[in-house]
Amino acid sequence: RDWARYGNQDHNSLHTKYVDFKEVEHIINQFKRPEIIDNVKFFKTMANGMVDPHSDNRSVAINIPIRTNDKQSTIFYESLGDYDNPNINVGDKKIITKAKRYNKVNETQRFILNQPACLNTSLPHGVENLSESDRVVLSISFKDEYDSFSRINNLYRSKQLI
């Protein structure tokens, strides 16, 4: 499968690639209800690159570090209003998306993804990679009514997720 690109240029874009469930069976099998998983993707941020502040089509993700280091940050923001809808580029095809890219933001939180994390992806967020190596994470999305940060968080806290 090809890598898709959210954005116009390699270094300030998020590169994504779907993963076959069989390839990550050992991870999916740790979930008590793997049937609630919608898809699993690799996300790549280029060396010395960034992913601009954006929100996803989905509301929640569990991101697992695959190749990361302490010069790569996940950043959350508050929107100051202005946003647009970026295209997804797959090869020479453009796909319209409901995701938003924010033009005016204030940073509210920054952390290094060195362990799995549950993210509220409906909030503006991005990535800064100040290292010489690409950053790669495995990102898990959830189906239908499970595409909810509070629902996944509650399942985790009540030991019903993993």
What are these regions (language model features)?
Residues 7-10, 19-25, 81, 115, ...:
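Generic alpha-helical secondary structure signal
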Residues 1-57:
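Signature of the catalytic double-stranded beta-helix
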Residues 35-116:
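Catalytic core of non-heme Fe(II) oxygenases with the double-stranded beta-helix
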Residues 23-25, 30, 35, 78, ...:
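Glutamate identity and glutamate-enriched acidic tracts
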Residues 87-162:
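Catalytic core of Fe(II)/2-oxoglutarate
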Residues 6, 18, 75-77, 83, ...:
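Sequence-level detector for tyrosine residue identity
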Residues 21, 31, 42-43, 76, ...:
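Phenylalanine-focused residue identity feature
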